[in-house]
Curated annotation (Swiss-Prot):
A zinc finger (TFIIS-type) spans 130-170. Belongs to the TFS-II family. Residues 9-129 form the TFIIS central domain. This is Transcription factor S-II-related protein.
Amino acid sequence: MTTVIEFYISDKEREIVIEQLLEFFPKKKNCKDIEKGIYDFTKQYCKSDNSYLRLAQAIYIDCAKNIMFNLKDENNHTIKKIKKLIDKNKYNAYNLAFLNPEELNKDNWIKIIARKQMTEETLNQMATVEWKPCYACKNTSYHFYQLQTRSADEPMTTFYICKNCMKTYKVNN
């Protein structure tokens, strides 16, 4: 016997999302368009890999919460611009659900990318050593650093970071 799982989001859940969106948009039509976008995004996401069908309700709620979280953020200038365009009917509200996180909050993602680049630059400036093959990727090139993690009368702990897969190994000498 096989169980068939179909895509389903309850009408009650959809109405709740529309009511929550009314807090941010004066026109109910815009809220319905955004909700329809969230619904279609969830459906498209679940159809891309049928194993996600069981999670349809959770994916739908997560997408709705993500949009509302960004709408509540006072410092998010990108979403404020999009909201004004939606209110003036110059931007299709339906498309809001299909925006990537970096499109919903550009300022935050610029900071995240800059932090990641700085971390990579710091890693590239660290000392490099050839050591035993990495268990994950078989690479033998590592960055390493030492920290005094235990009492002063014991040797320092050496940390090796694989340059290829970034897996960290700790060695107590």
